[in-house]
Design a protein with these regions (language model features):
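Terminal accessory carbohydrate-recognition/targeting modules of carbohydrate-active enzymes
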Residues: 1-211, 244, 252, 507, ...
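Short, ordered beta-strand-loop transition motifs
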Residues: 85-90, 154, 163-164, 343-346, ...
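The feature captures the catalytic groove of carbohydrate-active enzymes
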Residues: 161-171, 175, 179-181, 283, ...
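Extended, well-ordered alpha-helical scaffold segments
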Residues: 191-194, 211-218, 265-278, 319-341, ...
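Extended glycan-interaction surfaces of carbohydrate-active proteins
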Residues: 209-247, 272-292, 344-373, 412-493, ...
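Aromatic- and histidine-enriched alpha-helix N-cap/loop-to-helix transition segments
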Residues: 214, 245-256, 264, 296-307, ...
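Alpha-helical support elements that line or immediately flank enzyme active sites
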Residues: 248-279, 441-453, 498-511, 518
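Specific register positions within alpha-helical solenoid repeats of the TPR/Sel1-like families, i.e.
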Residues: 259-263, 307-314, 387, 394, ...
């Protein structure tokens, strides 16, 4: 395996972390909050900055350049350096030569907030307990001397541990109540080599047969570093949306990361797909989101899971077993019945959203007039999901007739009630009043692809072309009076809408337009990184800058584009 460790990353854009860890080193310490110093941040029980890590020289703070690679992080100044590397998911090793470092805890300790610092007589390590995370943070000095301030202090007071500029090395761990004393079973150099090898192997699996680019390796790092081990309510290995403030798994975001994982690791992909289903309630509904210490049911997310599982099977590195298919069938069936039984008004054929959050497009202009609406995207997703359920039923020896009957009824209602002749509209459930049709949301029935009447598909393709900018499909036309450059779903370009639209266009036969959508989105990712969303005019990254569904979508589109290029070259060669 070639050494490709020259991938330089920006600590202000992505955190330093590793697969399986709930920890990271970052300057991002909260919702849109950036600190000057790097902090140790945990995502157990929420996002909590635990320790401020400040380089020191001659008794004063030292301004340093931060150099970040997938396997190491360093603070550098005039030949002096501090380095950090992960030693497993719950520990970091840090060492310095020519620079010291202060590990500082919050100054305030109350009965409910802050940290308590003490020296543990068992092994001589220093321990900080955190009310915010409910965990302990143990610093074990492996080399050099440290100064400790504020040990056993309660109330208000300084609390820090500081290593001097002479060579030093410290292990920093996140613990529960107790653990065996830290034992350095590998040298620092061995840990660096192990982390480098682990990341490169992961990136190679994720990339599969596709050509490697700086974009694919950076996307791989975003996914790798945001992956956490099972803990709390997260019962499977999971890719969080980010190890910045979006540190959850939302019940549609996960689908796009599952697709990215599928070619290299079908087991991880299936776990990612099924994770929200572990918290499916008695009605069949999925939670809005899941994270370490919280499962939210106040909203749901759109039922794209039939579409996603169809794509997942097509991309997976191995066939799914009959038992796995049966599990997916059972979960998808309950999820679909929720929409048909609990989200249709009496006498109505079409299901409804209760709020924009249910659609995933929280504040899209479709919801400006009314919030409780029968929306065309919802019906289209359920039509696909019913198709997938019928196919799974046939493969498993179950009856499929009811699924097909429900599918046909929804398809008739979608075209008969929400298609105006040149566009889809949403409508209020109670009044029947039509909602705005300028949002890209209303064009999402293109996911039905070849199932759409040709004249409907052509109009949707034309609408999508009108949303397309140099960087991808804007969620609101840039010439709309409701367009907002940083308006969340009122203008910016997003990964999920792009992937869904690209897939539908291709299946509907609009290959050239699908190619343009794919190329534009890949271009904006290569230019601006894997942001939560992008300014549709400038291409600048917006909001959370290390968003995994963006990285996952890029990898999916990149792999598909390379596969098409290869197929075209083979076709030319055969002529």
């Amino acid at each position: 395996m070639a050494d490709r460790s020259d991938l330089a990353l920006d600590i202000d854009e992505v955190p330093f972390s590793t697969r399986g860890s709930w920890l990271d080193l970052s300057r991002i310490v909260g919702l849109h909050r950036r600190a000057d110093d790097v902090h140790l941040v945990t995502h157990r029980t929420g996002m909590h900055p635990i320790l401020r890590l400040t380089p020191r020289l001659d008794g004063a703070d030292a301004e340093c350049r931060v150099a970040l690679r997938p396997h190491t992080m360093a603070w550098e100044r005039d030949g002096a350096v501090i380095e950090a590397v992960f030693d497993g998911p719950d520990a970091l090793r840090l060492r310095g030569d020519g620079l010291g470092m202060r590990f500082a805890a919050p100054a305030e300790l109350t009965p409910f907030t802050g940290g308590y610092l003490f020296r543990d007589p068992l092994d001589g390590a220093f321990v900080l307990t955190s009310y915010e995370s409910g965990r302990r943070y143990r610093l074990t000095v492996l080399r050099g001397d440290v100064e400790v301030v504020g040990a056993e202090v309660t109330g208000s007071g300084k609390r820090h541990i500081e290593a001097g500029s002479a060579p030093w090395e410290i292990a920093l761990e996140e613990l529960g109540t107790a653990a065996a004393p830290y034992a350095a079973t590998a040298t620092f150099e061995e840990l660096v080599a192990r982390q480098r090898s682990a990341f490169e192997a992961y990136a190679d699996r994720l990339r599969g047969a596709a050509e490697e680019t700086p974009g694919t390796r950076k996307a791989a790092y975003v996914l790798w570093s945001a992956t956490v081990a099972p803990s709390g309510f997260v019962g499977r290995e999971a890719v969080l949306m980010s190890k910045h403030w979006m540190d959850k798994v939302w019940s549609w975001d996960h689908c796009f990361n599952a697709l990215a994982l599928a070619p290299g690791d079908a087991d991880a992909a299936l776990d990612q797909f099924l994770l929200p289903f572990d918290h499916q309630d008695a009605s069949g509904a999925l939670p809005d989101s899941v994270t370490h210490s919280e499962v939210l049911y106040n909203f749901v997310k759109p039922p794209i899971h039939g579409w996603a599982f169809r794509e997942l099977e097509a991309r997976a590195s191995r066939p799914f077993t009959p038992a796995e298919l049966a599990t997916v069938y059972e979960r998808l069936a309950a999820w679909t019945r929720f929409w048909l039984d609990s989200r249709r008004a009496p006498g109505h054929a079409l299901p409804y959203y209760q709020h924009g959050n249910d659609s995933g497009w929280d504040n899209a202009t479709t919801f400006d007039t009314d919030r409780v609406i029968e929306s065309p995207d919802l019906a289209a997703f359920l039509i696909l999901q019913l198709d997938v359920l019928a196919g799974l039923a046939d493969r498993l020896g179950e009856a499929s007739g009811d699924w097909m009957e429900a599918r046909d009824g929804l398809a008739r209602a979608l075209l008969g009630e929400l298609w105006t002749g040149d566009r889809f509209v949403a409508r209020a459930v109670d009044s029947g009043r039509p909602s705005s049709s300028t949002s890209l949301l209303n064009a999402l029935p293109i996911v039905l692809g070849e199932q759409l009447p040709p004249e409907v598909a052509e109009r949707l393709a034309a609408t999508i072309a009108g949303h397309l900018t140099e960087w991808g499909p804007a969620t609101e036309p840039v010439d709309s009076p409701r367009y907002e450059p940083d308006g969340y779903w009122r203008g910016p370009i997003w990964a999920p809408s792009t992937v869904l639209i690209e897939s539908g266009l291709r299946r509907a036969g609009f290959e050239e337009l699908a190619d343009r959508v794919s190329a534009a989105f890949r271009r904006v990712c290569e230019r601006s990184g894997f942001a939560e969303n992008f300014d549709a005019v400038t291409g600048d990254g917006l909001r959370d800058r290390a968003y995994t569904w963006t990285a996952g979508a890029y990898l999916v589109l990149h792999a598909d584009a390379r596969e098409r290029d290869t197929a075209r070259l083979l076709t030319i060669g055969e002529r």
